[in-house]
């Protein structure tokens, strides 16, 4: 009888221990995301999960085609471990609000008027950057954050080294979450013109790189460093910024832009909408982009008139093409095909690329202005992306004709040469 009671007591004790362990595991899952590790397919929108997985396999197999790019990424990530944290609150100038948590920047192409005693109001000199803008450091802090976090997140995904994830999350917390150093989710005082205004909608072009942060969050989801609380608070920040873009005077002003500014406004709206679960808004924006962005910005022969009118016509044409391609990539996430959209008179993303490609490979000369001269290699990432989409066009061959392309160009990792067995992988 005593033996039976003893066995029952032991059994009961074991059940209690196992129950406690199970509860502890559940609580731990509440603190850390239960979304798989770096070996899982990442939640990304502008990047392509299938291609990232292909690159990781190629890295593990020491594929020579991407080794230079992988080595460069590792060097960049190692350097990023010692950078930051970054914050806009460290600037020496205070915005009109009196709050250094508000982003602030000065219009780069505006200079003192030599005919005015005090130089005011500033006047426009397109394409010529006024070094005075560097007195306000917010745009530099933002650029450094975007580059470092993306680099660290990619390195973590490819290698699984938690050091990279930990540093990336540290930078994200400092810039977006820490009450002492966080940025307020608005650009009310971005790109002000001395003597004219305190801020403009055009400043939203400066946050186009935040879409890289959105994908970086997805790459970090499997890490030990990014908690579910972190992720939710980041989503809350982007949700507020998205709403500010939709409701504010500056946001509405940028939405109405008919050039690259309008394109990148849409890219941001869609990316942030997908992050916070507003898929209907993302789909609506993309459907409207057919006419609002592609049909109105691209001519039947592929020219982009509003970009060609600039003093850096090549850079702006290439940059807007990249933005249109980003919209098309985002369209894949919600079933809106912009890659193959074409108006009755032939306006399309493809035509815009085909207009620039002959210049990049040296078959034609650039007939428009470009301060400092064109850089043909800048079109390489777009051509590489097109090689995956338009398989009936020899963009893979054309890429080999673009001069001065760095073998360590990151696009080789983001859009790798897939092996024959993977040619039908999802775009």
Model-inferred region functions:
Residues 1-8:
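N-terminal secretory signal peptides that target proteins for export/translocation
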Residues 31-254, 263, 287, 298-299, ...:
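Extracellular glycan-targeting catalytic surfaces
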Residues 13-24:
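Bacterial N-terminal signal peptides
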Residues 287-308:
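Flexible internal linker/loop segments at domain or repeat junctions
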Residues 25-31:
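Signal peptide processing junction and immediate N-terminal pro/mature segment
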């Amino acid at each position: 009888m005593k033996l039976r009671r003893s066995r029952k007591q032991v059994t009961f004790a074991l059940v209690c221990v196992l129950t406690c362990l199970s509860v502890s595991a559940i609580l731990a899952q509440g603190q850390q995301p239960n979304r798989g590790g770096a070996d899982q397919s990442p939640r990304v929108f502008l990047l392509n999960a299938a291609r990232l997985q292909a690159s990781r396999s190629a890295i593990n197999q020491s594929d020579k085609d991407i080794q230079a790019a992988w080595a460069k990424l590792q060097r960049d990530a190692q350097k990023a471990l010692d950078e930051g944290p970054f914050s806009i609150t460290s600037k020496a100038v205070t915005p009109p609000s009196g709050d250094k948590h508000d982003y602030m920047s000065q219009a780069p192409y505006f200079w003192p008027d030599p005919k005015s005693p005090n130089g005011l109001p500033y006047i426009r000199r397109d394409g010529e950057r006024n070094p005075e803008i560097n007195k306000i450091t917010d745009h530099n802090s933002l650029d450094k954050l975007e580059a470092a976090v993306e680099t660290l997140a990619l390195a973590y995904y490819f290698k699984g080294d938690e050091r990279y994830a930990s540093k990336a999350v540290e930078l994200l917390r400092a810039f977006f979450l820490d009450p002492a150093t966080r940025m307020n989710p608005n650009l009310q005082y971005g790109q002000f013109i001395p003597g004219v205004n305190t801020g403009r909608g055009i400043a939203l072009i400066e946050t186009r790189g935040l879409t890289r942060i959105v994908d970086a969050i997805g790459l970090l989801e499997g890490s030990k460093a990014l908690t579910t609380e972190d992720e939710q608070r980041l989503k809350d920040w982007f949700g507020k910024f998205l709403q500010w873009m939709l409701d504010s005077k500056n946001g509405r002003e940028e939405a109405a832009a008919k050039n690259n500014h309008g394109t990148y406004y849409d890219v941001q709206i869609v990316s942030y909408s997908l992050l916070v679960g507003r898929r209907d808004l993302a789909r609506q924006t993309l459907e409207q982009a057919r006419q609002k962005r592609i049909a109105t910005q691209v001519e039947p022969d592929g020219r982009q008139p509003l970009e060609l009118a600039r003093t850096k016509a090549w850079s702006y044409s290439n940059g807007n093409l990249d933005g249109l391609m980003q919209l098309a990539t985002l369209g894949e996430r919600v079933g809106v095909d912009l890659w193959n959209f074409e108006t009755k008179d032939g306006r399309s993303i493809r035509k815009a690329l085909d207009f620039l490609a002959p210049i990049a490979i040296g078959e034609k000369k650039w007939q428009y202005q470009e301060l400092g001269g064109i850089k043909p290699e800048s079109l390489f990432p777009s051509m590489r992306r097109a090689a995956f989409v338009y398989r009936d066009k020899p963009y893979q061959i054309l890429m080999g004709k673009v001069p001065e392309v760095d073998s360590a160009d990151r696009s080789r990792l983001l859009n790798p040469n897939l092996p024959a067995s993977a040619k039908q992988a999802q775009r």
